Amino acid sequence: MTEQVSETEYRSRLMDGMAAAVAEKGYAETTIADIVRLARVSKRTFYEHFASKEDCLLALYTAATDQLIEVIRQAIESAHDMHSRVRCAHRAYLQRIKAHPLLMRTLFIEILAAGSRGLQVRRAANQRFADLLRATGADQHYDSPQKRQITPALAMAIVGGINELILQAMESDQIDQLLLIEEPATALLEAVLARTVAED
């Protein structure tokens, strides 16, 4: 019996193939032939879903971002106070990255090889993380109006700082030590959330 594969499954396999190929050869050296070989599909199937390998990489980046956002959101919703939310969110984020090191290295580093479009989707992803951070801070402000709200610029600075620590761990092949970032990342965000309006 011939296996019936849905269009969603084909797309998922192609993105998995992209992730595996880039992890093995780097984005610049990856070809569409590499992607379809690892995805076990034809080139025709590839072009039915993506116009180019760049489009495939950008789709992979966006899908992985969606998954990370959902993991963090679930961690936040499972916590009962602000301290727990902050710690659980950082832990979930770092554990997800540690569990998928090759994919995350592709996304953190290789996305830059996609040029201006890569920067655009990376910036959009960082904005989504910053928005989630601000929403978490807004919950605290609702409960404690004297607490200072997180501005858009401050949220982006926090996201950028934490991601830079992650990038350093990746570049120095210390992904196994990634959870050590949890403490400074949590301390940074808690310090920001602890500020009161009177301190401005």
Per-range role (PLM):
Residues R96, A135, P152-D176, L188-D200:
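Amphipathic C-terminal alpha-helical segment
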Residues M1-E9, H141-R148, V197-D200:
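N-terminal intrinsically disordered/low-complexity leader segments
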Residues R13, A21-D55, A59:
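Helix-turn-helix
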Residues S116-H141, Q149-E164, L180-E183, A187:
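Amphipathic alpha-helical packing segments from all-alpha helical-bundle domains
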Residues A59, Q74-L102, K147:
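Hydrophobic alpha-helical connector segments
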Residues D16, H83-K98, M156, G160, ...:
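Amphipathic alpha-helical segments that line or abut small-molecule/effector binding pockets
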Residues K98-R117, R134-G137, L167:
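Amphipathic alpha-helical segments used for helix-helix packing
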Residues E7-M18, I35, L60-L68:
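Generic hydrophobic, amphipathic alpha-helix propensity
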